[in-house]
Amino acid sequence: MTVSTESNFPHGASTQKPQSAEPEIYSSLTKSLDFSNDAEEKWWTRTAPLLSRILDSAGYTLPQQCQFLTLFNTLMIPNFGPHPHIWHSSITHSGLPVEFSVNYQPGKQPTVRIGFEPASSISGTARDPYNMVTVLNVLNKMSRLNFKGFDPSLFHTLISSLALSKNESDLLQGAKLEGSKFKTQAAFGLDLKGDAVTVKTYLYPALKCKVSGLAFSELLEAALAKHQNAHDFSRVLPLVQSYMEEGQCYNQYSFVGFDCVDSSKSRLKIYGALLDISWKKVEEVWTLGARLVNSETNKEGLRYMRALWEYLTPGKERRPVGIWNYELLPGSEEPMPKFYVDMNGENDFQNALGITKFLHHIGLTTTAEGLISKIQEYLYGVPHYPLSQTHVLFANQGPMQPRCEP
């Protein structure tokens, strides 16, 4: 479940914020913070209260909440750039550089995730037209934070094949993709598990495809050829590549993700996105064009996916946007598909109700029973906030997988 970071009230709704107490941990930390500029203070006051409420609702202990809010202030707040944002990030519909989400799995503590694309005052300027200077500065900062198991070597291996070189950047002269205002090349995701932080990287090769004239699949193969453990994906990668090309699923929205850990242990994720997607196409995507129809794991996952689709899209066979990824594990025999139901701009109460029904369906009854009240508190901390009047909290909802993620 993904939640927005800044509220935008629907047309006709009151824009007056209800009176409510700020989260205690957030308030205590804020008193001791010394911001370098007004932008940092604004990013903190507009985003940190929501993160604080999400951490609390997900069952994080008070020390953990303090730890991760402090990390948020140290690592991300100084690297969101000017406020209001000038650099348009690809990670959110609105172009904001940050997004919060919660991952629920049976038998496990919920995991809060922070997706962000670093930005700065030079992002998009002649000094950093495609934001890579800023991204690399933040990568170096994460290296100095000594996250357990953090290893940026795979980032450095793949970046030259999937992102613009200095010469290519100069050649494009700040140009964007056709029909888009986004120029993102890299972004990060942080999984907050227990007391630990796991870093994920996302690379967006569309601009590299534009300037090189090479297809996404060609760039990906060239990048993985430099990966010392590329043979670990030798069985499963051809399945994904052949379907994505056959199904005409590679486009300017395609990107890749991987874990910033020892490269022999890192997952590889290949993302696709299509506009105006039907349930029939979702089935095709899930089974890689019938390549996995005999897989029991794939069949079980598709049944979950159909249930989620029905709860979030009752009576409809099409949605405006479809986003998915194929997760490739080292040495795996088949990819694990994950599909994200894009709920941007839809009624918050109907979305929350659909998710609640799905959680009941998969046996997360306790989580389901308290979910709507928790979501209501996300908006300014009001327990009974009228979600039927808002369309701001949800972006994407992914399916529960038949097995737990590693």
Swiss-Prot record:
Biochemical pathway: Alkaloid biosynthesis
Function according to Swiss-Prot or TrEMBL: Prenyltransferase; part of the gene cluster that mediates the biosynthesis of paraherquamide, a fungal indole alkaloid that belongs to a family of natural products containing a characteristic bicyclo[2.2.2]diazaoctane core. The first steps in the biosynthesis of paraherquamide is the production of the beta-methyl-proline precursor from L-isoleucine. They require oxidation of a terminally hydroxylated L-isoleucine to the corresponding aldehyde by enzymes which have still to be identified.
InterPro entries documented for this protein: Aro_prenylTrfase (IPR033964), Aro_prenylTrfase_DMATS (IPR017795), DMATS-type_fun (IPR012148)
Chain positions recorded as brevianamide F binding sites: E99, Y204
GO molecular function: prenyltransferase activity
A UniProt-annotated Pfam family: Trp_DMAT
Sequence ranges of Polar residues compositional bias: 1-19
Record family assignment: Belongs to the tryptophan dimethylallyltransferase family.
Residues engaged in binding dimethylallyl diphosphate: R113, K200, Y202, K269, Y271, Y340
An example Gene Ontology biological process: alkaloid metabolic process
Record-linked PANTHER family: INDOLE PRENYLTRANSFERASE TDIB-RELATED, PRENYLTRANSFERASE ASQH2-RELATED
Keywords: Alkaloid metabolism, Prenyltransferase, Transferase
Entry EC number(s): 2.5.1.-
Source species of the chain: Penicillium fellutanum
Swiss-Prot/TrEMBL site (Required for regioselectivity) positions: G115
Protein name per UniProt: Prenyltransferase phqJ
Region (Disordered): 1-23
